[in-house]
From Swiss-Prot:
Residues 1-10 have a biased composition (Basic and acidic residues). Residues 1-23 are annotated as: Disordered. InterPro entries: CsbD (IPR008462), YjbJ_sf (IPR036629). The lineage of its organism: Bacteria, Bacillati, Bacillota, Bacilli, Lactobacillales. Gene3D superfamilies: YjbJ. Belongs to the UPF0337 (CsbD) family. This is UPF0337 protein SPy_2005/M5005_Spy1709.
Amino acid sequence: MSEEKLKSKIEQASGGLKEGAGKLTGDKELEAKGFVEKTIAKGKELADDAKEAVEGAVDAVKEKLK
């Protein structure tokens, strides 16, 4: 797992905890902040996955051209 992916997973967990705490306490602002943090972190994770896939495809093409 890449460092960026690990960081995204930690941010997702943190956002989920904030969202859950907001739901439990009725703090809509904390709940919303947690949801946004979690969603942004998931987007970063998906971007990192796409980057890795493209790098893998480029490497495969380079190998075939040798």
